[in-house]
Design a protein with these regions (language model features):
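Active-site lining segments of carbohydrate-active enzymes
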Residues: 3-137, 141-144, 156
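Carbohydrate-active enzyme catalytic cores, enriched for enzymes
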Residues: 123-270
Length: 270
């Protein structure tokens, strides 16, 4: 009560709010997957928390008509997780449609044709690729009722910028599947190449070449990689195999699985 939603340092950066929301929801789903049960008072408070995150993200997007990067991509991914979790409403339908539309646009903008992130940093490439692959997997797993929101939303209810394109969101066949999704074939091609890029910038010692910025930022950190330094475990931030493992959850390529090894099968399964 002393620090309500929207107040304090933890709400200053929308990227942080978005990543926090996605991680809270990931943790919730992991608890549910192993049989955890939550009582009604908890769920009421939990849903209110997630709704507050969604409202904050939607009204504080880090968008710029020219200069936007991983912060805005995180905003989109976080809002997508929120919209996918919450029950359908006129508001959450617009959040879902907006997130999907912008995810497709930003993948085309922020990743080059060879799959590399434009920020010229393998570590930022990992961060942004994680946002894309987990957001993509989430959309591909949406139930029919949620998918219907992509054709039934009212774009006039979206009051933030950039604007929300009118319904419906166009749907395409998923390559190699009978499923349909809002992602065109070129989107999947670029996502697959994100993993290929990570493989190509990884040295024989299993660590990526340290080029450009590296603030160790992650979207999800499910199975961190550690090395022993002076007899103590230390996280190895230059081991990016988990990103390739996560992307391989969508493509099931033997080369990706061989590169990632057995340590990150959890990321693949998610």
């Amino acid at each position: 009560a002393a620090t309500p939603p929207g107040y304090g340092v933890n709400w200053l950066c929308t990227m942080d709010v978005a990543i926090r929301a996605a991680n809270i929801l990931m943790a919730y789903d992991l608890f549910i997957s192993v049989g955890a049960e939550f009582d009604e008072p908890f769920l009421l408070e939990f849903n209110a928390l997630i709704l507050a995150h969604g409202k904050h993200i939607a009204s504080h997007l880090e968008w710029h008509d020219i200069h936007r990067a991983n912060h805005y991509l995180a905003d989109i991914a976080g809002l997508l997780f929120v919209a996918a979790y919450l029950s359908r409403s006129a508001e959450t339908d617009t959040w879902l449609a907006f997130s999907v539309q912008q995810l497709i646009k930003e993948v085309g903008l922020q990743f080059t044709s060879d799959g590399a992130n434009f920020e010229a940093s393998p570590s930022y490439h990992r961060l942004s690729s994680e946002m894309v692959v987990y957001a993509t997997a989430l959309v591909l797993s949406l139930p029919d009722d949620k998918m219907a929101a992509l054709t039934e939303f009212d774009n006039h209810l979206w009051l933030s910028h950039p604007p929300l394109d009118p319904a419906p969101v166009e749907l395409f066949p998923v390559p190699g599947s009978a499923q349909i999704s809002p992602f065109p074939a070129r989107y999947f091609e670029r996502l697959e190449r994100m993993a290929e890029f990570t493989i190509h910038v990884t040295k024989p010692n299993g660590r990526i070449a340290q080029i450009g910025d590296n603030d160790s930022g992650r979207f999800f950190k499910l199975c961190p990689s550690f090395v022993e330094v002076d007899g103590k475990p230390q996280e190895q931030h230059l081991d990016h195999r988990s990103t390739v493992a996560a992307i391989n959850g969508l493509f099931d390529r033997s080369g990706f699985a061989e590169f990632a090894g057995p340590d990150f099968t959890f990321e693949t399964s998610i």
